[in-house]
Amino acid sequence: MRRDGVFAGLLAALVLLLLPGTALAAPGDPWVAYVANSVVTKQSAAAPVILRADPATGALAEISRNGAQGDLFRHPYDIAVAGDGSLLVADMGAYATSTDHTPDGRIIRVDPVTGRQSVVASGEHLVDPAALTVAPDGLVYVVENVGTARTPAVISVNPASGAQSVIAQGGELCYPFGIAFEPRGSLVVTSYGDFSDGTTVVNCAYDFGALIRIDLASKSQSVLSRNAPEWGNLFRNPLGVTVDAAGRILVVNQNGGTALMGVDPNTGVQDAESPNTGTDRFVVPQRPAVTPDGDVVVSDFTLDDLEGGLVSVKLSTGAQSILRQDRTLFNNPLGVAIVPNRAPAAALSAAPALVAGGRRVSFDASASRDPEGLQLRYDWDLDGNGSFETAGGTTPTITRAYAGTTTLTARVRVSDPHGASAVAGAVVRVDSIRPVLSGLAIRRSTITYRLSEGARVTIQLQRKVRRRWRAVRTLRQNGVAGRNRLRAGSRARAAGRPRRVRYRAQAFAVDVVGNRSRVVRLRVSAAAARRLRR
């Protein structure tokens, strides 16, 4: 395997990393693959269209199909992941014919969490959009396979407004099906070459296809590689194309004995990476995507079960293995996109962490972070039973009141759009038991009492004036569980005290969370009252 120009490739990769919106990935980082099936019905019923494969768990999940999530899919041809984590799908609509070039193609956005479909752009220049790529600045570049005037083109699409602009048209482009963004700031496009199915006939200048570079500054086209002595003779109807982190170009041939080939971005020289013979996994390979480890995942239209799936290629050896195959979910896949996906970091705080029964606790997970900067979703286990019964959407805060006395660990599960998640917990203590104050007694200037738990105790000496009890002195103490003693200090005697007055002591306790005991009252003699008032 050729690895020329590594230093130049690393410099190009550095340029890419400096551009805003570029996701950073390192060898060993976890990742998932998204797949777009090209056939949207099976046995006259809506079938899965967008799938997600997780190589770490082996899981294959359906993300979206026509129905409750939308009804926009007709002929999906490619898929890419936008900077915000949403999925972008190039859909051809109804295939163009020799007499009908109706611009009914679409770029569809799919929410990877809900599967909901929405239109980013449609019509205008989009007749049969065959592929798309997302630049580091978020702009989407689309290969238009046919064109309204039967002239293929490359179209830019603003993902926010859907506005379309023609970047390149005609020229070297002939039956193009693949596009990729290069770190140097240009595009590479695969021209398929000659094609005939009995109805559609395409004749290209380069029978077996070519790789075209488009300079975005000048919008000029040039042939980067094709079948020729100076480049090699490996092109056999190239369809998909991608660029690895070092800037090296990887192309998938739909036909011929070389399924995956590398193309030097500086010289155009071709290098066979993985074969397609009768003993290989490949049958009808379509598009490549590069993993963080530098290996390649290729979509195959049929595989050996005619439904297709994903093939993993170890780039250092060219060895192939089935990454995922499932007759229920795969339906002739074309598009494949890989997104590095490290798990988020979850954080949770509870305030107050110790609370009285019936009062609300506020939970805050806003300190949680996603390594790729994607929006997180929050699911809550507020009763501490281990099941996340409360969906919080994208709101990182929630409140809950607890009635009974308990100690529990509430948890939050934070999930990114691509299925990675993490859990954090916070301990909550709920105290709904009122403190018990008993054994109130006064002997000379000393007050004693008992508490069931530590609490703040308030003791008032009251006298009765005209049928109403009025406080004449208030004492407070932080009591402990068990027996407590409070010695009342002397205070100046009030002047003009009536000689015959009734006195009482009234006491209550409030614990640390605000639970209040019942009031305890004790009749106090005038002599004892005089001592307490001193």
For the regions a protein language model found, what residue spans apply to each?
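Beta-rich, blade/repeat-based domains predominating
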Residues: A26-P30, A45-A47, Q69-D84, D104, ...
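Glycine-centered tight-turn motifs at strand-turn-strand junctions
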Residues: R468-P498
